[in-house]
Amino acid sequence: MSTNNTTTNNEDLISSLYPPPPPYYKFFTKDNLQKLSTWQENNQTTTVSSEVKLEEENTDPDSNNSEENSIPPGELRFLIPPKQPEGPQYRGYGNIWLFEDKLPNLKDSQWEQLYNTSTSTFTSTSTSTANTNIITNTDTDINGNQEVDAGDSTGDENLTSETKIKELHKLMDSLLLNFLELIGILSIDPIKYDKKIHDINLILININHLLNTYRPHQSRESLIMLLKNQIDYKFLEIDQINKKCLDIKSKIKNLINERITVVSDGTTTNTTTTTKTTGLGDGDSIDEKEQLKQDIINRLLSSI
């Protein structure tokens, strides 16, 4: 019984590795495709005739009837591809995705914005007063900074690097102060810790949101580094290929020079005797050259 249970469990695991195909794949047959083509031809003729009648009667066509006429009946409707989703977002794989790839602001995420998005208000007095508010009272820092440009949806895109650094420093100071206040509350009245935990959570979310604004810059820099590494690797491969080519050329030259010297030493002593005794002509010299080439190739292959 135990072996049967293990085999059934293994079969379930194997069958659950990949999801089964959708059931409407069975409708994609040649007969249904032919029926769909005939239906589309008939539907085009009927729609043209109905539009002509509506123009003659000066009546507006009903949108519901037109949508119903554009959908084939029965199982043929599964052969028509679905329409593109309308609106700013769509659902896929259990999540909601935006068509426009941008970082949502904190207001859209139902969180309070603590940092200031206006770049014109960053003077020495404003930063000093903000820092004093952080040190004296953290609650006024959270509520006070939240009121400034909290509803600006495009402020995050217009933030400069200097502004982000200043706001991150202020948020870090506020985070440290809230942590110290939380320790003091826990030592005096631990029941009142909830409000400080909420403030720390809110500050951390704002810090995380500001850091996420650096994601496009990080992706560009990482892409540049990847391309530079690929270019360096290609140059290294080219250098190695050139070195191998030069090495092979030098080996070929050395083999040719060695063979020529050996042949020249042997032929100079025996040229007169071979021509007198055998009477060989130009054909024999051609055979010697071919043999020389073959010997050089063989030695080259053996050396490689």
Curated annotation (Swiss-Prot):
Compartments reported by the entry: Nucleus
GO biological-process terms attached to the record: negative regulation of transcription by RNA polymerase II; positive regulation of transcription elongation by RNA polymerase II; positive regulation of transcription initiation by RNA polymerase II; regulation of transcription by RNA polymerase II; RNA polymerase II preinitiation complex assembly
Leader sequence residues: none
GO cellular component, as recorded: core mediator complex; mediator complex
Single Gene Ontology MF annotation: transcription coactivator activity
Assembly behavior: Component of the Mediator complex.
Protein name: Mediator of RNA polymerase II transcription subunit 7
Natural source organism: Candida albicans (strain SC5314 / ATCC MYA-2876)
